[in-house]
Amino acid sequence: EYLGDRYQSEFMRLAVSLLSLVLFFYLAGQLVSGVVMFEIMLGLNAEWALGITTLVLLFYVVLGGAHADILTDGFQGALMLVLAVLVIVLTLMGYGIDGGLFALVDNLEAQDPNLATALNPSTPLYHSWWSIFVIAFAHMPLGLLPHLGNKLWALDSTQDRFQFVKLAALFGLMLGMLGLGGLLARAYFGDALYAEGANPNQALPLLFIEIFPTWLAALIGIGVLSAVMSTADGLVVS
């Protein structure tokens, strides 16, 4: 509706509506992440985990609409930032590994030399600088993140929108560094996450369970779940 009114074009309105159907795949990915969190942290089976994730999401989105989405995303986003800072610090400290960060790098190199280099030819995600650029571009705020658009368009002034873009870029960079937690998880668990029946998506929750008391791991897990829910509700509203 915003783009159609902005450019006074029914074609633009219709085209964006049709393209928005692709968001169902993005939403499905977020729900799967929620399933993983509930499976690991609460021991639920996949069906119950998916049902709970979906019901909680729909409950506050249906009752509150875009307003509920914006308010809850503000709270969830704060939790995500705290979690991101925690993961970055833990990784840079090489937490729980004798020798700290340098021992962490040595550990990864001993498992596979490609894990300690900028490029990893054995994976399609990081086999070239071009693939890394594409991944970075896909995560640029307001580039390919439609769930942020409704927050931007809810602002009245151009100044507020510009401020939003700056903050989104900064926070987006910090949240992207959550991937550093994968390095620490690989040092702890090795190839176990790639064994038959295992799921690499469980890396962060398993890492928290390994290095923290149960109550603290559960609390941190809420931060991970916040990332899932804040993205999913934004996609539903979009």
What are these regions (language model features)?
Residues 1-64, 134-139, 225-234:
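Helix-loop-helix module between adjacent transmembrane segments
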Residues 29-32, 36, 89, 147, ...:
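Transmembrane alpha-helix boundary and packing residues in multipass membrane permease domains
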